[in-house]
């Protein structure tokens, strides 16, 4: 870590005043991109938060790109930072920063997005959510809130949508790229919550290493080509991430994918139809479903199953002769493959295709999280929750083991 890199270099009063006021003044002009990083380091990831901010400072904002970070750590209060080449300056005085905030509060996220759009205007916007992730179970845990109030809080899927919806109502801006620098977030249960408010998502089916996104690489690439659109920048993030971890020995279970939200509705309808078909023939084909689920890639949470892999297994399963099931499964494959623009995987996850879905294989696996999953809009607004519940409750299954 560079000394004082979070808050800028120590200088004489005159120089400091010049630096402090240069950032917000130059940021007023509309640029090509504003990248907002919601960096929740108020937990055991604090060291990585500082590291990633230092990486951004290796490039910094310029005439075409703004990098804005809301950074919270265990060691001190949160601060709103404008990242420049070699330093970051506090620019949140008008909003009371630095101050202690609960990064698990969706209102804090909403305000941050609104500040980024209003105070750092651009043609295109990216928001990166940085912290621990639990897939549909949530993102952004705040340990200071836990220590002070005993509340193990996070931003839930419902709250995440509320934050982006609220920011949209204030700014009328759809976010071009939402990146999840957090584990296990590449799920339709997650992407469904950002329909209408985001164009492209970058996320991982598997866990994300503590080092997270390579911020120096993605920042350098964006500054070098600031006119890229949302799809291109999302692909840049994914490619840089893949290349970065391919260069590090031992990183063998890394995944990253880009999802085009244009296809979210089509995918939702397809999964709904598949759940209905699977449920209707559950008593006939339960063991086939079990086998096809186990043969698909799974992740740190073993109840997260690769969606396209499972659907393709159904299509190719000779023990299933129900045309309705196969047709519905094929439509899931088509919709998901349209939506997943790129998917990079390391050797452990070579069969991963970019989206996982919650599909527990055991009764306990379903019922330990049943009440939580019932709160997930994608699950209950489609047939998927009903299918998972019925499947987990069904007696007489033959337990298969993954082959190959």
Over which residues does each language-model region extend?
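Extracytoplasmic mature domains of secreted/periplasmic and thylakoid-lumen proteins
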Residues: 102-172
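Structural recognition of the beta-strand scaffold that forms the well-ordered cores
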Residues: 34-38, 66-71, 125-129, 176-180, ...
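Secretory targeting signatures
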Residues: 1-28
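Terminal, contiguous helix-loop blocks that mediate binding/assembly
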Residues: 29, 140-404
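N-terminal extension/subdomain marker
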Residues: 28-122
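Residue-level signal for short, function-critical loop segments
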Residues: 39-41, 73, 131-133, 361-363
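Gly/Ser/Thr-rich loops at beta-strand to alpha-helix junctions
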Residues: 42-45, 131-137, 179, 183-187
